[in-house]
Amino acid sequence: MTRENELLRKILRGENEYWEELIGMYYEDIYRYCIYHAPDRNLAQDAVQETFLKVIRYFPNYRDRGKFRAFLYKVASNVCTDQWRKCREEEIPEDTVYLETGYARSEDDIRFLERVRALPEELREIVYLKYAQELTMREIAKVLNIPMRTVQSKLRRALGILKC
């Protein structure tokens, strides 16, 4: 049994003191996800907090219906989407993601980012979830609420575009 599953079982039994450890396991990943999707850094931090509050609130509805990680990313996705609707602003610059993660940019990085940025949103989201967040195809399908075969074909299409 993984540590995540152990914590989930304890929380399901009402041992709420284990939330802190479970949240700690995913905090950085969800923060990076929200930085990528939120209009600015402060809203990303708000989105992370709101994500975990909603996960705690709606956890009884989860009840081991698939991977917890996919459930968590789905909640984060919904929170960020709600923020975008409220702000009605353009997508955050990719520079923010690099500054947050401390990556240095090379010319190749810049060219690649420009090509990724040029992808349609639906393809860009799948590429980001697959390679930046390292979600499985099945987890991406759950997060985006689309069939796994659709995820596979869209990822294949995105990679084909990026190779050109």
Language-model regions, residue ranges each:
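C-terminal flanking helix
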Residues: Y27, Y31, F52, P120, ...
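Arg/Lys-rich amphipathic alpha helix in sigma70-family domain 2
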Residues: P60-D64, K74-E94
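DNA-recognition helix of helix-turn-helix
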Residues: S77, T81, L123, A132, ...
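Structural recognition of an alpha-helix C-terminal capping motif at a helix-to-coil junction
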Residues: R32, D46-L53, G66-N78
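Sigma70-family region 2
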Residues: L12-R13, E50-K67, K86-C87
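Amphipathic alpha-helical segment used for protein-protein interaction
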Residues: R9, R13-N16, R88, V97-V143
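N-terminal module of bacterial RNA polymerase sigma factors
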Residues: M1-D29, Y36, R117, E139, ...
